[in-house]
Amino acid sequence: MKKLFLSAMLGLSLISCSALQNQKTMTTDWKHTTNIYEVNVRQFSKEGTFKAVEKELPRLKRMGVETLWFMPITPIAQKNKKGTLGSQYAAQDYTSINPEFGTLEDFKSVVNEAHKMGFKVI
């Protein structure tokens, strides 16, 4: 009886050890640990342009920013707009860049430079 009990305990121990080896180790993905800096281009600088944001990337890096979230960058709808500037969240065209901020090439430039510096960009 004692041998049977010890054999059963040994068997259970081996089964539990092999079960632990089969479990996947949970990895923490960057999206769960990163900090995010929302870049509202219009209010980011006096110029309110992509080029002005690009000049400030080193400062954002020194601040410890890891991810840049550009919000919003589309042209602003003019129909029923609020105030003189309108709401940036009222997009006129989701496939275009707001010309007040610069060109598509200007936006690509700031994104490319941000990537070179190790930022993630949303």
Q: How would you label these PLM feature ranges?
A:
Residues 17, 22-122:
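Acidic/aromatic-lined carbohydrate-recognition and catalytic surfaces
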Residues 7-16:
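Bacterial N-terminal signal peptides
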Residues 1-4:
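Positively charged n-region of N-terminal signal peptides that target proteins for export
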